[in-house]
Amino acid sequence: MTNIRKTHPLMKIVNDVFVDLPTPSNISSWWNFGSLLGLCLITQILTGLFLAMHYTPDTTTAFSSVAHICRDVNYGWVIRYLHANGASMFFICLYAHMGRGLYYGSYAFRETWNIGVILLFTVMATAFMGYVLPWGQMSFWGATVITNLLSAIPYIGTTLVEWIWGGFSVDKATLTRFFAFHFILPFIILALAMVHLIFLHETGSNNPTGIPSDMDKIPFHPYYTTKDILGALLLILTLLMLTLFVPDLLGDPDNYTPANPLSTPTHIKPEWYFLFAYAILRSIPNKLGGVLALLLSILILALIPMLHTSKQRSMMFRPFSQFLFWVLIADLLTLTWIGGQPVEHPYVIVGQFASILYFLLILVLMPVTSLIENKLMKW
């Protein structure tokens, strides 16, 4: 008799994803991040659910309700900090996952890659709205500054901003709708992640060499379930270390001051995972130009499959492209650092150089280098 996992309509789906999935035999630990992102998402949904049971989305009580969660709710402080630091872990895994895709040419799976870009936008929107909810100083001013960027859109900008705010400033209506969106978006992310997987399983996984591996596949279970559990344990360990030892390491002290529309913080900045984009936004002295650069810095990812000029898929055997890839990573780290610095010399000029280099690398240097490598291969 056939095993029930292969015949039962629901178990068959799970089986095809986690058990009998043919997987390349040579994928490295960089392929762990997909499952880790799934784990992060489940953790965030669960901790978020318990936080929502005690949180009140009202300007007068939001800050107090977060303090109440931390002080009076059983293990409320653990849930709150798991959720806050879980977001940081989510983005670490997300950026590692994208870096892997860039390095090994996984973007050649166009549908999977494009759904991934949409997922990135959705996760960024969710994280931004979540940051507004504690209603601290940085929550309020972050929401004001970022939503205000939409006013740069010609003709409809101001109307659009006031429509999003639900009034003439960030207020009760804004907080309520942000809470509603912050609650629903993770479930949309979950659905999109399933679509992401469906598209991936149409083609099968890529591998470090970028060469088709149809002749050398192994079942996902037990090989990669075991490998993924190791990654999951390391992720959980890191998250617990952050939460229990340095819960505020990645946060902003300003957010422990209740929101005050009459007092602007000295330096308004988003969470660390948005700083690279924030630095690109600030490096252009024109409002509309900055907003466009900010959008393009993420949207450029959708162009990457079209910018691939190499005859090889992966960068594994392309040393010049590898060098430029690591320059790009260094550039993004520089932008992240600049985004957290005040707007003064020399940070402004460094940020402008780093922003130009970011676009130059992706749009010009990497495609041209790939063409040169193609020529060198003929020698």
UniProtKB/Swiss-Prot annotation:
PROSITE patterns: CYTB_CTER, CYTB_NTER. Binds 2 heme b groups non-covalently. It holds the Pfam family Cytochrome_B. GO terms for biological process: mitochondrial electron transport, ubiquinol to cytochrome c. It is a multi-pass membrane protein. The chain crosses the membrane at residues 33-53, 77-98, 113-133, 178-198, 226-246, 288-308, 320-340, 347-367. The keyword Membrane applies. Gene3D superfamilies: Cytochrome Bc1 Complex, Chain C. Its cofactor is heme b. Component of the ubiquinol-cytochrome c reductase complex (complex III or cytochrome b-c1 complex) that is part of the mitochondrial respiratory chain. The b-c1 complex mediates electron transfer from ubiquinol to cytochrome c. Contributes to the generation of a proton gradient across the mitochondrial membrane that is then used for ATP synthesis. This is Cytochrome b. It comes from Balaenoptera brydei (Bryde's whale). The gene is MT-CYB.
